[in-house]
């Protein structure tokens, strides 16, 4: 055994042995030595995009997964921990444009490097199940399921106003528009009308909502709430404002009815205007004869189409000059075009009730529109000068200024108004959803080809199943001018499957969220080229633990749930939900340093380039560049980012201090679900702990060898031996509990305390002490093994544990020796007249009389009682003894 800890050689030796043994190859229905079947556990991290290198967020995510997998294997579970690559998407195209190489080469080069990094981390991944989204063997099944959905009417083609990213030249889903900008390019999003394929996720809205509310107790509450809000079920009333507005053909536009939806039917008598979306037929009609309105409509097409984007945008409008009729009062109501109204939500029109809706109130104040109060609350004074929250209190209010509906409570007013509108044939109660069908068509090259052929005679024709996959050419180099598939004759040219005439392939590819909606099931059946999934999927799924970032709460997780339900309804699955438990790990943060450039931009500096300036309390208040002493701004801590020069390269850390140091730090520094603030001193502390562990093993190697060979009778062991065993087993019990709670930072803390206890124990020489050293160090190595597998495995080998107990890879999780936790002696606090004066040690089962006698005989008692005899002695069992005199 080498005297000093050398992480590179230790980790290389461990990994070579594990790879030669195929240590992490997993099979279904694995058996115990007695022939019984092991329980299964499927633990999976969200698959990475192969961007080039791992970042510390990856290291944290995968180490959490690896700790869980290793510890559960020790507990006797058959654990699956797979890995794959979310390999399609725009970044590969952008990189290809920049480097002038095909996206396929860039992607596969990155995969090779990142896979090497993952292996260097010592992750217990079954690489035989690896999948890659850009492999035709994988995306064939995207295409196959799309065709099945097309047959069932779940997939369909339509023309609709969409979010268009002018830089990436593609359609974005609502969820991919952040603050009015494309989530990848950052470009302002435009609205365009374009044909594409959609999936009817709205058909599953009720089930998606019901199950996320009631059937996912293992998910974080905030994620469930985010999905509930995104699905957005609303119970309300859909009704029409009649009108006589005719189009150029002389027919009434939309049959003379402007439909709106409201959840506040009790306020209908307060409508003073209606607003329609810029794409609404009434807006289009009015704009034909109004140049100013036409210009406003075009302006509205800039920006996204999400509710979140609309909520932050300044509300603007323009009158159309058109009016509709209030269905209950007969009053003429002005129609406006509003930039905050979405054509894709409801009927593309809203009623304006300024007195009882904050958005409408602001709009009416801005444009001088009437504000009519129709709900009053006792004790509240109505005013049109400023919005007051009580206006929206529907339960406490009563209707006013509402004719025959005056004096009604919310539900009574809703029911009465709904009944009258229904009787007129212009209204009915209805449930609506914020959720919209999922548009999957993308005008980009690097994605799954949509298996459709366009024929001049037959129209869009599905590619026959036997012709799948439609293979994406992997040698194209994008030039930034749109989709290169549209210029590739070899891909485009084909024959119509229906009539045999020359035809053209669909050039749109699928949204990359299609790839990530089911990859975790392909891990279970990776080698099946005849079916999307097979019986092995029934064995592993649903997944027991999914691990990933909170940023995927709405996008990926909602789509994966929908995809699972579609596969179930097609007879491919026998379960409803894909993920039983979800852990959202916190971000990794680091310090941010910057200053403005002369050109008005911002220049960021690496933390190692600066020296911090501290205040009297030790807080960072500024920084100076090391190279010239000039000042830079300290921006606090934020998520590690290449753009802000505050990332830490995991490879550099692995090369210098080892993967175990990186793993130990990211697990110890913070609970898994909370943010982790990077600390160089914390990393050094983690490495120092590992050096101490190695030094302890080296120092006690001979004693451990003797102890493993001889054992001991613990009942007859000296008191220091019993005390060490009691302390270590107590820490084992705590670590065991914390492993089950996924509180891995406190697991590491327990291991550090174990090391201190073993290192500091004043053990006498002899067989019992040797056996105690062997036992307690062996316990520490097993508890610590899931965190830092390389050093613990190597010490296990070098110290002789493998010879006596087998390979650490196969070692069972240690059981707590309850007998070791029972103390022969206990310590009681000693008080004299209620004040703490020391402590005494007594037999754990000492009778009260013995405790009183021992306490009264203490020197401290005589001194503080000044020689007087005690009047009485009070014993609080297991805690203290108080001598009163």
From Swiss-Prot:
Binding site for ATP: 642
PROSITE patterns reported in the protein's UniProt record: AA_TRNA_LIGASE_I
GO cellular component: cytosol
Signal peptide range: none
Annotated GO MF terms: aminoacyl-tRNA deacylase activity; ATP binding; leucine-tRNA ligase activity
Catalytic EC class: ligase
GO-annotated biological processes: leucyl-tRNA aminoacylation
Keywords: Aminoacyl-tRNA synthetase, ATP-binding, Cytoplasm, Ligase, Nucleotide-binding, Protein biosynthesis
Motif 'HIGH' region, residue range(s) on this chain: 48-58
Short motif 'KMSKS' region, span: 639-643
Chain ranges passing through the membrane: none
Pfam families with a match to the protein in the record: Anticodon_1, tRNA-synt_1, tRNA-synt_1_2, tRNA-synt_1g
Localization: Cytoplasm
EC number: 6.1.1.4
Reactions accelerated catalytically: tRNA(Leu) + L-leucine + ATP = L-leucyl-tRNA(Leu) + AMP + diphosphate
Similarity comment: Belongs to the class-I aminoacyl-tRNA synthetase family.
Alphabetical list of NCBIfam families matching this protein: leuS_bact (TIGR00396)
UniProt protein name: Leucine--tRNA ligase
Organism expressing this protein natively: Bordetella pertussis (strain Tohama I / ATCC BAA-589 / NCTC 13251)
């Amino acid at each position: 055994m080498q005297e000093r800890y050398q992480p590179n050689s230790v980790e290389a030796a461990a990994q070579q042995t594990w790879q030669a043994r195929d240590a992490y190859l997993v099979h279904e229905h694995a058996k115990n030595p007695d022939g019984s079947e092991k329980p299964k556990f499927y633990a999976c991290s969200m698959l990475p995009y192969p961007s080039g290198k791992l970042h510390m967020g990856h290291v944290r995510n995968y180490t959490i997964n690896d700790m869980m997998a290793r510890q559960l294997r020790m507990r006797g579970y058959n654990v699956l921990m797979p890995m794959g690559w979310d390999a399609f998407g725009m970044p590969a195209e952008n990189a290809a444009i920049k480097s002038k190489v095909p996206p396929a080469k860039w992607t596969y080069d990155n995969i090779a490097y990142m896979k090497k990094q993952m292996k260097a981390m010592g992750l217990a991944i079954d690489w035989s199940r690896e999948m890659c989204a850009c492999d035709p063997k994988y995306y064939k099944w995207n295409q196959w399921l799309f065709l099945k959905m097309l047959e069932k009417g779940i997939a369909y083609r339509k023309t609709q106003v969409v979010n268009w990213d002018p830089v990436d030249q593609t359609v974005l889903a609502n969820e991919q528009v952040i603050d009015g900008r494309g989530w990848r390019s950052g470009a302002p999003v435009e609205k365009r009308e374009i044909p594409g394929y959609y999936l009817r996720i709205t058909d599953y809205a009720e089930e998606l909502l019901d199950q996320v509310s009631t059937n996912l107790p293992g998910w974080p509450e905030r994620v469930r709430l985010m999905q509930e809000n995104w699905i957005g079920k609303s119970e309300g009333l859909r009704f029409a404002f009649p009108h006589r507005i005719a189009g150029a053909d002389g027919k009434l536009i939309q049959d003379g009815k402007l439909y709106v939806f409201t959840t506040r039917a009790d306020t209908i008598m307060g409508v003073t205007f209606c607003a329609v979306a810029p794409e609404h037929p009434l807006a289009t009609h009015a704009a034909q004869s109004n140049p100013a309105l036409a210009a406003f409509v075009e302006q509205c097409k800039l920006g996204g189409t999400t509710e979140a984007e609309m909520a932050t945008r300044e509300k603007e409008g323009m009158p159309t000059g058109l009016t509709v009729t209030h269905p209950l009062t007969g009053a003429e109501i002005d129609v406006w075009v509003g930039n905050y109204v979405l054509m894709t939500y409801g009927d593309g029109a809203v009623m304006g009730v300024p007195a009882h809706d904050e958005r409408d109130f602001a709009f009416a104040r801005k444009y001088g529109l009437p504000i009519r109060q129709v709900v009053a609350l006792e004790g509240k004074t109505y005013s049109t000068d400023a919005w007051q929250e009580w206006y929206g209190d529907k339960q406490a209010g009563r209707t006013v200024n509402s004719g025959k509906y005056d004096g009604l409570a919310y539900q009574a007013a809703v029911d009465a108004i709904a009944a009258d509108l229904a009787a007129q044939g212009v209204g009915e109660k209805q449930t609506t959803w914020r959720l919209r069908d999922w548009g999957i068509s993308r005008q980009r090259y690097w994605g799954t080809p949509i298996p459709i052929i366009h024929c001049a005679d037959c129209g869009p024709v599905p590619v026959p199943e036997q012709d799948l996959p439609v293979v994406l050419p992997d040698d194209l180099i994008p030039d930034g001018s749109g989709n290169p598939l549209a210029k590739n004759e070899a891909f485009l040219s084909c024959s119509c499957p229906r009539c045999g005439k020359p035809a053209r392939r669909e050039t749109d590819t699928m949204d990359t969220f299609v790839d990530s909606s089911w990859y975790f099931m392909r891990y279970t059946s990776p080698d099946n080229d005849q079916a999307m999934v097979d019986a092995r999927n029934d064995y592993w799924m649903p997944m027991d633990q999914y691990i990933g970032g909170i940023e995927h709460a709405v996008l990926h997780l909602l789509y994966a749930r929908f995809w699972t339900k579609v596969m179930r309804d097609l007879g491919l699955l026998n379960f409803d939900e894909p993920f039983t438990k979800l852990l959202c790990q916190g971000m990794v943060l680091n310090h941010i340093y910057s200053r403005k450039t002369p050109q008005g931009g911002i220049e960021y500096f690496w933390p190692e380039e600066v020296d911090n300036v501290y205040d009297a309390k030790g807080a960072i208040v500024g920084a100076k560049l090391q190279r010239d002493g000039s000042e830079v701004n300290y921006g606090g801590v934020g998520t590690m980012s290449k753009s802000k020069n505050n990332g830490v390269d995991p490879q550099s850390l692995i090369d210098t201090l080892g993967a175990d140091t990186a793993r130990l730090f990211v697990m110890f520094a913070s609970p898994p679900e909370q943010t982790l603030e990077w600390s160089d001193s914390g990393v050094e502390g983690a490495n120092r702990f590992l050096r101490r562990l190695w030094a302890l093993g080296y120092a006690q190697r001979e004693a451990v060898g003797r102890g493993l060979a001889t054992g001991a009778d613990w009942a007859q062991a000296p008191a220091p031996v019993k005390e060490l065993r009691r302390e270590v087993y107590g820490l084992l019990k705590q670590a065991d509990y914390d492993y089950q709670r996924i509180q891995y930072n406190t697991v590491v803390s327990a291991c550090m305390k174990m090391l201190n206890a073993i290192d500091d124990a004043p053990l006498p020489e002899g067989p019992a002490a040797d056996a105690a050293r062997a036992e307690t160090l062996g316990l520490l190595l097993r508890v610590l093994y899931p965190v830092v597998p390389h050093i613990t495995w190597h010490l296990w080998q070098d110290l002789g544990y493998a010879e006596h107990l087998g390979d650490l890879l196969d070692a069972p999780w240690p059981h707590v020796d309850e007998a070791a936790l029972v103390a022969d002696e206990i310590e009681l606090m000693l008080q004299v007249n209620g004040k703490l004066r020391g402590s005494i040690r007594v037999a754990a089962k000492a009778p009260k009389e013995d405790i009183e006698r021992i306490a009264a005989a203490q020197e401290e008692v005589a001194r503080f009682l000044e020689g007087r005899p005690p009047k009485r002695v009070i014993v609080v069992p297991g805690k203290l003894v108080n001598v009163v005199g």
